[in-house]
Amino acid sequence: IREQVMGQLRRRGAVVGLSGGIDSSVVSALCVRALGADRVHGLFMPEHHTSEDALRLGSKLAQTLGISTTLEDIAPVLHGLGCYRRQDDAVRTAVPDFGPGWKCKLVLPSILESNRLNVTQLTVQAPSGQTQTVRLSSTAYLQMVAATNFKQRVRKMTEYYHADRLNYAVAGTPNLLEYDQGFFVKQGDGAADFKPIAHLYKTQVYQLAEYLGVPEEIRQRAPTTDTFSMPQTQEEFYFAL
C-alpha cells in the first residue's frame, strides 16, 4: 500500500468510503497500518435508504482507528438524477399501490427452494407491515438496477473529489469473490486507484479483520448491500445458489 500510494501514485494518503461493513473496515485498518492514521480519510455517504447501523459502525471504526472523516449526504444528488423516482416507477409496474411509506428490495431465492428457473424477484412491504413477493418484467428489473447503480457511482465521484483536494488516492474495498463473480458496479465500487483486498476471499478478510483489531460488532455483522429500503443480505441479492 505504501509503495502504491506514495511511490507509484505519488499521493500523500488514502480516502476510504466507510459503510460499517467488514471490507471497508479492513481496508481502512490496512491503510492506517501502512500510511498512518493522519494520512487516511474516511467518508460517510448516506442516502435515504442507508441503515442507521452503517453510520454508527462506521463512526465506531473511525474512532477506533483515529482517522479523520467527512459526512456527505448524497440524497440530494440522487434526487436530482431521478434515482428514487426511476426505481419507484419500475416497482409500480408490478405493484401499482407502491408509494410513500412502502419499502422494497430485490431477492434471488435459493434454487434449493424452487423447482423452476431461478430468477430475481421483488419483495415489497406495505406501511402496515404486510409483505409480498412478485416477479418483475425484465425491463422493470433492469431499470431498477440501473437506478440504484446511481448510488455507487455518486459515492465514487465523491471519493475522488476528496482524494483530489487532499492529494490522496482512492482505496477500493471489493474482495476477491466480488471481483471474481462480477459483484460490483462499473465506475462505481469497482473503480479505485488501488485495491488492497482484491486478492482475498471473504473468509480471509474476516481473519485479517480480527488480526487488525476491527471492532467485534463489525466482524459479527452479516454482509449487506445497504442499497434498498428493506434490509437485504448479499446472498439474497447476488450470491444465492
Describe the role of every protein-language-model region.
Residues 1-174:
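ATP-dependent adenylation/nucleotidyltransferase module used to activate substrates
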Residues 172-241:
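Mid-to-C-terminal catalytic subdomains of enzymes
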